[in-house]
Every structure is written in C-alpha cells, then in structure tokens.
C-alpha cells in the first residue's frame, strides 16, 4: 500500500475495520441506519413533528431500501481535517452552501462613471473624493432599506439586514488614497503585487461600486430582483448626496445607468423554459465562478486553486442548480461531494500536476492534440488503477459517473496546467471520458456522457454557440444543460490554466475584485473550509429572522 496517496487517511478512518485494499467484505452487520447519529436525530425530530401535525406521516428511515447495509460513511472534506456525515453536505442542511449561493445572487457591480459624467456635464455639479464618500454613506443607509428622499416611507429593521452594504473600488491609486477606507476594496492590499498591477491595468481609472443586497431579499425574491433593488437605492442616494431634484430629466440617466448601462451581474438571464432571471446559478459562467472564488490571491498552487473552484462549483451547479432548480430531490449531493471529499480528486490532480511538471513544466508546452492525448491518458489510467487497487475507494465513489467526473477533472486540469489553455484542458476531459468508457464499457446513467461524445467537435470548431471559448460557457451552454457531474469540473478546468499562469483573474477583473471582500461571511478564499464549517454546524449565516418571530419558536 502506497502511504503517499492522499486519499488513504480518509479511507482508513471511514471504513475503520477494513483495510483500503481488502478484496472481501461484509453486509448487514453495521447497525443499519442507526449507525448514523444524524439519521437518529432525524428520526427523533420526525416523530415529534408527526405528532405536532396531527399524525400526518413524516420521515421514516425504515421505508424504502434498507439503509445501512454497508458502512454509512463519514466524509472528509478535502483539504481540511473535518469528517462530516453525508447528510450535512446537502445544501438544505448546510448553512454555508446556502450563504455562498446567496452571496452570489445578492451581488451586483455598478459603474459610477456614467453617473458622475451626468452630474458634471449635464448638471454642472462637481464630483470629488469628498462627494463620492458622502454618496457612499448615503447608499449604505439606503441599500439596506433606509429612506432618504421623502417622509412617511416605511423602513427595514437594520437587525434583519446587517449583511447589506455597498463598497467601492478603482484602478486609480490616487483616488483610492482619498476614499473612505471603511468602504474601499483596496486592490493593493487584497492582492499580491503582480496581480494587483494586472487588475489595475485592466480597470484603469474607472470606479465601481459593489452592492450586496440583503440576503433575506434574495431568499424571499430571486437574483433578478438584485439589480432593481440596487438601482432604486442608487438613484435615491445620488439625489440625496448631490442635492438633486427628484423629478428632473437627468434622473432618468441615473436610472438607466444603474439598471442597465453600467450594471455587471453575476449571471445572465435564462431562457423561458428554465424561467430564471439574472443572478441565478444557471446563468453563472464557469469563468465567472472561477473569479468569484478567491483562492488564487492567497495561494500560488495551481492544483489547490483549481480544487477550491471545483468544490464551490459542485455546491452551486450540481447541488443547487441541477439538483434542485432543475431536478429536485436529494440524490445530486452524492455526485457533487465526490469532487470535494476524501482527498480523492486532490490525489488525482496532484499526480497529474507532478507528471506535467516533470515532463513538460507548468505552462511548458503548446496545446497540441499529442499533448492532450499524452497527459489525459496518463492521468486517466492512473485514476482507474486506484479504483481497481483499493475497493474501498470504489465503494466511496460507488457511482460510475462519480468516478468518470473525478478522473476526467484531473485529466482536464492537468492538461490545462501544461498548456495554460482551457480548450486543451476541456479536450483532456473529453478524451478521459472516452478512454474510461472504453475501459469500463459504460460510465454513469444513460446519457451521462452525451456531451462528452460530441465535446471535441464543438470545442475545436468556430461556431456561434458550440464554439464558445471555455471560460464563457456555463450551465446554459448547449449540451451542458442537465448532465450532473460535469459543470463543477468544467469550472475547475476554466480556472486551471489561469492558476498555472499566475493570472490575477480568469474572465472578469471586476468580479475578481468584488469578491475580495473580508466582510462576506462565506470565505471565498477557501470554499471547502466554509462548507466543512457548515456541515459541522459552525457556520453563522446571514438573513436570519429571529427579530420578527416569537421567542422560542
């Protein structure tokens, strides 16, 4: 047994009495569902709830397939020391995953330069660092639900919306020096020097505000509400800070800029058959999510950076988007957790990165099909060999599509590390799927590999939608729409080449800066750590309603 393998520690703890390489096992001797402390807790609560609601049947683990035929495994959240029950990784049971999704949905970036130009050129009002600071005070009063323009307006209790605020950033160091440090996202402080210079060169002298609408708003409404909530308060705050007349024609220009012209949302609107507005998970492009995750500003390890992106994306795309918005139910959690538990994908990715570093060097070769074929084949075969050598690893990833996703993710990321090219990376993924199917005759459920069979022809063509570069693809990209066990890994492959090159951002420098924000309760520098805290019930979410409900309820 090779003790260097990253997943062995987790396997030994998960299965306890069975060695990871043991070829024979037992069934129905582990205590059934009662071996799980969480399922016992569920059962106790369900009995009380059933009585309270007049005997209407409720949760009963004895219904359906017998639970606990084998070990009900704990899961080690990769990159941490936390062992958690699988149930606690379901997004409904995990406050951190909920908050991550909420933080994305409730964020909107709005350019300030159009509004400043209207003030100066149409209204003859001077804009200075002092007036900008005054405006930022006004928006931080109005955005959570405070009134600024007229009397007899109802307001929101601040205790319900403590998480709501607006911040500002700019690529102009001179302006940044004069802005209120309480509301400034300081690029020079939050990013390594080289990354900061790269970001400032892209942003230039432009100025942007980042508005975090209250969590409770996106819980009650949806992501499409966010730009509207933001725009209304922006208009009111400009009127207040610059002493404008609410009815004059120039106010329409503020409204247009705040609602449309200068708005950067986290996700695009979905088509009618998916019926979701902007800022919903299905519209978040893979490169956008890679920029939302902040691992690249605190680590220079391409593997770790990519793995953190995959973990967060697993929760967003597989658990919440496909698993609930598009499907509903509980089963998609297991697809997602395969990519961020027990250090299995970590082992495969680090193996691939070491192979690449030894043979080519990081970003050391051109993106050719020969390179794709070599790296993808090597990493895929290594991954499949581990499943054959360690039966408990195979049991951990009990579904064929789990194994296919993890092996292909490692192949794709490794190819991207070598080439610094996401298109080469995604073709490494596609080849891995084909090799895997050749070896095992099938992958996962029927149609799992539909998109992988046609992937190379799409990604190597120039077409209006199928030929889209990988970073700009997302859950709504043709053929990517429904098959679980793909989208999180695609986000990691979008990140991998940029992590290898040391880029400051993947797709959008504004989004990268917007989430370099220490006041967010979800830690986007380390999604796995936050998800683990949520599973351990150690994560405190925003948007709670204790202030307005009866005590003790």
From Swiss-Prot:
Coenzyme M binds at residues 335, 446. Keywords: Metal-binding, Methanogenesis, Methylation, Nickel, Transferase. This is Methyl-coenzyme M reductase II subunit alpha. Pathway: One-carbon metabolism; methyl-coenzyme M reduction; methane from methyl-coenzyme M: step 1/1. MCR is a hexamer of two alpha, two beta, and two gamma chains, forming a dimer of heterotrimers. The modification 1-thioglycine is found at residue 447. Its cofactor is coenzyme F430.
């Amino acid at each position: 047994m090779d003790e260097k393998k990253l997943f062995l520690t987790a396997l030994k703890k998960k299965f306890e009495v069975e060695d990871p390489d043991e070829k024979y096992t037992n069934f129905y001797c582990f205590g059934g569902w009662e071996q799980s402390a969480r399922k016992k807790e569920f059962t106790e609560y369900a009995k009380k709830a059933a009585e309270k609601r007049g005997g209407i049947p409720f949760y009963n683990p004895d219904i359906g397939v017998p639970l606990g035929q084998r070990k009900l495994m704990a899961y080690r959240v990769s990159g941490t020391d936390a062992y958690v029950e699988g149930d606690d990784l379901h997004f409904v049971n995990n406050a951190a995953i909920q908050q991550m999704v909420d933080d994305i949905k409730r964020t909107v970036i709005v350019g300030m330069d159009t509004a400043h130009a209207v003030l100066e050129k149409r209204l003859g009002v001077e804009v200075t660092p002092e007036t900008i600071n005054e405006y930022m005070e006004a928006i931080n009063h109005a955005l959570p639900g405070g009134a600024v323009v007229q009397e007899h307006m109802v307001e929101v209790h601040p205790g319900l919306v403590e998480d709501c605020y607006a911040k500002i950033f700019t690529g102009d160091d001179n302006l940044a020096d004069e802005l209120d440090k309480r509301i400034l996202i300081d690029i020079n402080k939050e990013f390594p020097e080289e990354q900061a210079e790269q970001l400032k060169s892209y942003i230039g002298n432009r100025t942007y505000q980042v508005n975090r609408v209250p969590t409770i708003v996106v819980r009650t409404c949806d992501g499409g509400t966010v730009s509207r909530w933001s725009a209304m308060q922006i208009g009111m705050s400009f009127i207040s800070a610059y002493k404008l007349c609410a009815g004059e024609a120039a106010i329409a220009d503020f409204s247009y800029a705040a609602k449309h012209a200068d708005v950067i949302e986290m996700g695009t609107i979905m088509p009618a058959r998916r019926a979701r507005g902007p800022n919903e998970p299905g519209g978040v492009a893979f490169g956008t999510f890679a920029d939302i995750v902040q691992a690249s500003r605190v680590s220079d390890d391409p593997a770790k950076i990519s793995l953190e992106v995959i973990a967060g994306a697993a929760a967003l795309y597989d658990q919440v988007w496909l698993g609930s918005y598009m499907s509903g139910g509980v089963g998609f959690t297991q697809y997602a957790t395969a990519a961020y538990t027990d250090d299995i994908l970590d082992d495969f990715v680090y193996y691939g990165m070491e192979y690449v570093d030894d043979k080519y060097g990081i970003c050391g070769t051109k993106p050719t099909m020969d390179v794709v074929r070599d790296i993808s084949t090597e990493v895929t075969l290594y991954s499949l060999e581990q499943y054959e050598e360690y039966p408990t690893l195979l049991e951990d990833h009990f579904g064929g599509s789990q194994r296919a996703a993890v092996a292909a993710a490692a192949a794709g990321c490794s190819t991207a590390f070598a080439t610094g090219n996401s298109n080469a990376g995604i073709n490494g993924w596609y080849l891995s799927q084909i090799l895997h199917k050749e070896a095992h005759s099938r992958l996962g459920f029927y149609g799992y590999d539909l998109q992988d069979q046609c992937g190379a022809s799409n990604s190597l063509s120039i077409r209006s939608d199928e030929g889209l570069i990988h970073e700009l693809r997302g859950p709504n990209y043709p053929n990517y729409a429904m098959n679980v066990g793909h989208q999180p890994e695609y986000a990691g492959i979008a990140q991998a080449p940029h992590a290898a090159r040391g880029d400051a951002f993947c797709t959008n420098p504004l989004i990268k800066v917007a989430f370099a924000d220490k006041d967010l309760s979800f830690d986007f520098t380390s999604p796995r750590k936050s998800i683990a805290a949520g599973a351990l019930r150690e994560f405190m979410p925003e948007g709670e309603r204790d202030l307005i409900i009866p005590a003790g309820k």
